[in-house]
Amino acid sequence: MKYYFRYVEEIKPPLNGAMLRGLSVDKAANGHFLVKASNKVGMKTKDFIDLAVGQHDELADEVQLDVSKAESRDTVSRLSDLYHKTHGKNLVPKSEESIQVKLIGDMGMQVPVIGFVDLITEDDMIVDTKVRSQNRAIDLSRDIQLVTYSKITNINKIAIAQVVDTKEPKSDLIVHEVSELSISSVSQKIRSVSGAIRKRVFLPAPEGSWYCSKKWCFYWKICPYGESSK
């Protein structure tokens, strides 16, 4: 249903607090890896934090924050510091062209795919930067985005470089080797979803999904499977 509201009805959800914090850390990470691709070191911690906080402050007044601006800003500072000291230190970009790589391709079934890879490392690993508010179990073998990128680029190793805003902030690099079984499973999902979209059949999220809720879905109030169904 999110696809229907976003791309058929063209109702674009506004940037929220969590998205802003993620965007801010992501921008700093991109800047850091661009510098690191040329000097092998990257940005200093202070410069990394300043870039993330600057991005946050630039957009904060346009966003309906879930906490005060000062608290949101402090969170960005804390998480960007953690990201820089872990992923920023340990991950090495393949080249300057391996940051924010635009991909255009398909899964071999005439379903076009356009996307952006945050980072491709020197040891051929596709990395997606994530900022999360909760520590959730992640199964990358079922990640449609990253498995699709793996298929298009012929790079088998995928990863999520995440920082999690828990009481004690955590940094994790979750790595997975993509198998033919994963590619086949994701291809089948894409085939089913694209076929349904062409037939204008828009299904709800799986029952019990955390993202199908008032807290996490912008379309909750207008979705027939959201508030009106309760």
Q: What residues fall within each predicted segment?
A:
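Hydrophobic (often cysteine-bearing) scaffold residues that line and stabilize catalytic clefts
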Residues: 17, 21, 68, 72, ...
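A non-catalytic, helix-rich entry segment at domain boundaries
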Residues: 28-103
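Residue-level recognition of conserved beta-strand positions in structured domain cores
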Residues: 7, 128-131, 162
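Non-catalytic protein-protein interaction segments used by genome-maintenance enzymes to assemble
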Residues: 100-152
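Short amphipathic alpha-helical segments and their helix-coil junctions
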Residues: 1-13, 54-60, 125-126, 191-202
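Short, charged/polar micro-motifs that form catalytic or ligand-binding hotspots
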Residues: 11-19, 134-140, 207
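Nuclease catalytic cores
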Residues: 1-37, 219
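Metal-dependent nuclease catalytic regions and adjoining charged, substrate-binding loops involved
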Residues: 43-53, 61, 72, 76-80, ...
